[in-house]
Amino acid sequence: MRAADAGAFAQRAAQIVAAMSTRERAASVVMGHIPTTDAASLSSYMTQTGIGGFILMGANIPGDEASLRAITTALTPDPALPPLIAVDQEGGDVARLGWDPFPSALALKNEPAAAAQDAFAGRGALLLRAGINVNFGIVADVAPDASSFIYRRALGTTPQASAERVTAAVRGEASGALSTLKHFPGHGAAPGDSHTLIPATGMSKGEWEASDGMPFRAGIDAGAELLMFGHLAFTAVDGAPASLSAEWHRVAREELGFEGVTITDDLGMLEASGLAEYRDPVANAVAALAAGNDMVLAVMFSTADTAMRVVDGIVAAVESGALPAERLEDAATRVTELRLELAAAGRGMVPCGDCEAVAG
């Protein structure tokens, strides 16, 4: 994207957000979910909540592209400002679209980096055909241990190998769905499954820079548009999970130069840890925004009213001063800018006259 274009989008986003109410700003930074394939229900959900994004899970995916395209159309009330419609389409173990024929990280880690570029070029195009504009698909974690739960999903077993394949994957998706790097600052160093606990490591900042940080720096340099923060703690840097850590957000912005949208991993995972301090999903969302996330993702334990409860909580936090209004404005502006870029690039919905021919 040319600098002049980026400046124009930023200016327009700032104007749009300046005209928003606090509630509209709060809604714009929430990515929600309801488990249905009913287009009318999905359309109503997006219209009533006004949220800025939706994540498609298995319960949202029908058996063919044409039906999925109808769903993503229903999720887009205003094509001029399309929501971020995301999916976890890594390939292999984590793949929502069953008709994805492209190799997963388990195979790609043993192939030249060019294979990762080809796979993610195909995958990104496949998603865009169906109206999915964000892929939570590039696992930038370094996983040398085959017994690690993230091993099969990581693109490399060494920092250099991972960095090469992450770079290739981002370049591959450049004309397809937007790229997301996950799980910053790196799941490989923190043992354990963050779906059920808060993995932790005592790795120092210097050690991280020379190892697990390398693939993220490479992916950012390659142009990844989103960065997903994991619910894992590097205790030598910050005792809090990275998703709630202002310091890790500072590192991403100031040291790695990331200028895109930061988003949490599913906040329901914090609840699933069983720790008392994370049992309130609304408080988790507010804390995540305060730490520097531009968008909060809510899937696990979510119901049809979860998004609005989170929005209400964000509004209340701004009104009480617990969440600075400027932080919410900044987050809403960054998300809105990305949505405007999607609309201008035509990456919200592309022609797909033969969708019916591709089925799972």
Describe each model-derived feature in a short phrase.
Residues D118-G122, E164, A168, A210-P215, ...:
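A non-catalytic, amphipathic alpha-helix used as a structural packing/dimerization or gating element
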Residues A27-I34, G52-L56, P83-Q89, V134-I138, ...:
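Hydrophobic faces of well-ordered beta-strands that scaffold small-molecule active sites
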Residues M1-G52, E255, S273-G360:
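Preference for extracellular/luminal or secreted protein segments
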Residues G32, T47, I51-I61, T72-D78:
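A short aromatic-anchored loop/beta-hairpin motif
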Residues S21, P62-A74, A161-L323:
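Second-shell residues forming the walls of enzyme active-site clefts
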Residues T76-P101, A119-V142, S162-G186:
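Glycine-rich, aromatic-flanked loop segments that form ligand/cofactor-binding clefts
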Residues A113-A114, S148-S162, V166:
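Active-site cleft segment of glycoside hydrolase catalytic domains centered on the general acid/base Glu
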Residues P101-A113, G156:
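A charged helix-plus-loop insertion that forms the helical arch/lid used to bind
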